[in-house]
């Protein structure tokens, strides 16, 4: 029990809650980590951001479509990179709504998994093979079980690797980790029975697989019991022999003797308990030889509550101590069940001194080991050290609570001892250093005995307590060196799959991989398919992964459900009654929700719905609870619920500074000072309240100003509760009432004291006296001592006690280790956040020993947060059924309904319109309630289990189960990891002295390379593009293959628009050639005329998507720095300036300063300028038939309004202040040397481009920055051709730019061989002016006029003659260095277009 928590609790807080919390004040940080981990346990990073094409691609399920799966693996990054996410990605992940689906990422390849994971799975595989081999080599004696020989022979021959049921209805597929497909390989050993085949794979590892013939692949194995899974669950074989003996080590080697249970145990155990004992033996012992020579394995005994797990463990321990070398066993149990465990040991295995000397050994066999107990009676360190030392020396079983073990085993507890004595003293404090040293030595001795080396076997009762791997209790348990660990739990999966992983990771460390690997492979696929709004593929993947996880754990998790009880106990009915709020409750709830709505999601309510739940509980249980809290002026966060999931610092604290230590608490053990300081800070420090967003009950004062307490009708829940109590008593049935709120239990007692008891059935008593505590009813909560608890339970269960009819219990204190079969009716007054608690409360009566039909009533306030929490319970229970029990419960709630817990409905249906059909209820008490109080119930009561019906039609067929496991294996292997590209070859080596490079600039420097070592930059990861695409790999030698068809995609325009992305569909009227990249293997990336393209503008940039699925991304480099020189061509008349350069034509240029305040304005994709421009191309194409040869004089660059064409430059480099100043005077003009880097290229003048298609205002080039733009081509899609439309017609009129001043391009835009950012050779020979390939001119250029507008370097392939000024001489090898200098020393996968 968490003593520090209890010590500072108000009387309303149930100490049992803290008993379950078990964390000291030093663990607050760990609880914060737990809360953060629960918010982000999916293991993803950048992929948490919404993928806009997610639903259309449906996560590229590898097992559904291998082709899509391979593509998905290429698009996904590896799990190993998840830790390297940026802060921006983290912020965006946190902003994502909780109810949105998550992207499911693929796991690392299997060879990249942690070695410990592969080792753990391999060891389990080998263990199951050994057991199977033992069954084959040493079959069961035919005389052992009382079953037919035919049935037995079938089981002996066909039982494979701890099968769950008869082989005729069960298949086993052990996961294959070999590199190839092992389904079609391997030796086949066939058995003719039931047409089943047992295959032994011959891959890298031998794996046992069972397959059916083709006729049975689509059949569902519906004969098996779905709630039973694991080994030894065939109760037909779990029987005693003809002599009444129970054999434990079945199929044992001949050199080992038969091991039987003690005679008194053999007479008591049921068939399912025999299976559990054998299951424990197979996992922990396996064989006597292996027990002494190996470290062993752990397992989980996941039997539902009431199936006798304690008896199974006691029986197994008796065998363990008698027949193995085991000496010590540590049993860690909830502190309130310590006495129950000791009583069970004494009952089933009495100590020798308790038996008479002449007792018959064949009837009762005493235990041969001691049972040591460490409880709250052992206060001092010396007393505890004595118990531990006796246990370590004499051997036996040591029983202790979780909190005690944590305190004694963690080393940090040793140094905290002196801090606890920091209270003020009246005089000088004398410290006995010798005594302190002795204390420390004793603590170290205890820790060594408990953990190093620790016991031979560790048993954790209620093992679902190991649900947070960061909590100190879990860490302390994992420090135990023993690998023989047993977890007992009736409810293995409570809240989420990560908690299940924590429990499995305790018994089998690293078996399921790391937390992130488990999240990616199992948790998120299962969660994504849980709700009604999940896609069909999500649901299919959910069923697949649930089955794979269920099968993975089948060898060491034995699950037995309530179906075992149903065959041996009377029937049980659970009814849910949805209750209406009274007027005062509705007013209070409305006001509270309005405060929440005004505060927004950033308030404390939105951040932690459980805090709101604590306040709301006071409203819907009864307004008197809230009224009393208001009178005491308690803070809103001082709830009185025993809720363990409240996260950080949500426990309620006492208003006063007094510390209340319960008799059964561990308050003396734990430091109270820190908690007291925290308590005082809450009370006395207003700023602390504000910082923690603490809200008082001020909002309720006005509504409750005239409130009259003590009226039962103010809460319809309470009215129905007393109806159920009194009617049950009249029928002669005892009843239990569970509530989380201790204040609510107190209010119930106040109303009981005012009401008269009804006359029980068959009683001659008279009605008249009121209820009296400890006479007519009992109350049990966390403050009840262990001895008092045992006395109350025994008296209540006594059939002869006809005075006590009611038992009030707090949900957390009364749901564990309590047997209350004296009652057969239960009322769950309020829904718990954790469905486990309510289920355990129900099972207090529905267990062995119950002789009457059981009726359960769950009261839930409709149209409130409580209803949403109940809905969440159903989802959690459904997930448990899928994973643990392999059931297929029907999904009833959408994810939005589940996650949006603070759902507020202002108006509820009119009570007068509600009609309840009471005839549909066979239960008399409920039927009478519907007749008498129809106005208090919103809907007809329904059965709780009806929401979790097993959908038989959704069960996986045998073929689907194989496909699920095969897909799981393929997915582990096939993901392709992304490796970050290295750009080291683009930068100077460390040994280069930068001062020795003339006029040093990275753009003037190029690395020395061999002839074939061209700089090749890696492609950006495909995830940078919002829409996934399929890369096309086209050979350089086959340019025509660029037009090859690719896999078509359905373009999700509606999802893009819904996400706020602007999508514009444009039909091109002319060919558009996309500039290429240095790493491109495409020789032609072209958008043909008449093709429909989508221009997509999002927050991250602008994209073009072609009809064949290709994506071209355009990124803006941002605004230019203020210090940069921006040039603008001067305005003037035609030919006013002298020619500067010649590349076959004349142009005018005179650089001048451009107004820095006038950047090019961006245009939207549907702007009039763009649409007009496209229309001009359409008009030109229509008139091309009559005008075949555009004239040269119409194509000068001195037209009015032409803006300077863009300049290509590296993204990460600044513009030079003055290029001419860097050229040595003795060199010739550098622009005459410009060419393609490395080997040559095309010289494309800006006259071949229309400026509106080049400048940043074009939607193709537009980015969010609105400034200069650049291409960012994220895949091997580009073509090394340059420019946009190359076809110029005289019919095209030139649009004026945004600048009003007429201008001409500056001189540096008109060189021969205009440099473009490509460092690879496009042609077999090196040329200054290479001819265009003929494929690019396939649109029919004019051929009859030599005076073409196109430069002469097109002549060799287009029938044009070169202009007189065109030079086509090849450059000497040394003349390319200046021409390529501007393109070196940078990231070649980014091309920036900057307007000068």
Curated annotation (Swiss-Prot):
The keyword Oxidoreductase does not apply. The lineage of its organism: Eukaryota, Metazoa, Chordata, Craniata, Vertebrata. Leu-Xaa-Xaa-Leu-Leu (LXXLL) motifs are known to be important for the association with nuclear receptors. This is Helicase ARIP4. PROSITE patterns: HELICASE_ATP_BIND_1, HELICASE_CTER. ATP binds at residues 303-310. Its main location: nucleus. Residues 11-49, 1380-1396 have a biased composition (Acidic residues). The gene is rad54l2. A motif (DEAH box) lies at residues 461-464. A motif (LXXLL motif 2) lies at residues 1273-1277. It catalyses: ATP + H2O = ADP + phosphate + H(+). One of its GO terms (molecular function) is helicase activity. Keywords: ATP-binding, DNA-binding, Helicase, Hydrolase, Nucleotide-binding, Nucleus, Repeat. Residues 290-510 form the Helicase ATP-binding domain. It comes from the Eukaryota. DNA helicase that modulates androgen receptor (AR)-dependent transactivation in a promoter-dependent manner. InterPro entries: ARIP4-like, ARIP4_DEXHc, Helicase_ATP-bd, Helicase_C-like, P-loop_NTPase, SNF2-like_sf, SNF2/RAD54-like_C, SNF2_N.
